Amino acid sequence: MKETGGSIVNLSSVAGIIGDASSLAYCASKGAVRLLTKSAALHCARARYGIRVNSVHPSFAETPMVLDGIARARDPERLRAGLERASPMGRMGKAEEVANTILFLASDESSFTTGAEFMVDGGLTAQ
């Protein structure tokens, strides 16, 4: 990749940005992805490798991991409603919305983007 350039897109989470008292290890690991991304972006840019490194930080999206967690809850409808209320847009994200952000970052359309954090969170971190 050093010779040809390219794009690395790391998948993190808003939990690496805002934290959650009930998910300490998860938040720490996602925060580490955030800083790994920034450090790798600087390294690759300064070395002139032509490699862009960015991160995507989704909030609750309708993915197998999230949907399974909702299904296992004591009151799935209540949990889902709470997650939807937490989003300024009033809904959970869709896996395709996260995927489209990743596709953009992997494409040449983002050729001057490196070290960036993309929140796909319906405005959650804007609050």
Region spans (language model):
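Residue(s) in the substrate-gating loop at a strand-loop-helix junction
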Residues: 13
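Alpha-helical segment proximal to the catalytic Tyr-Lys
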Residues: 42-46, 111
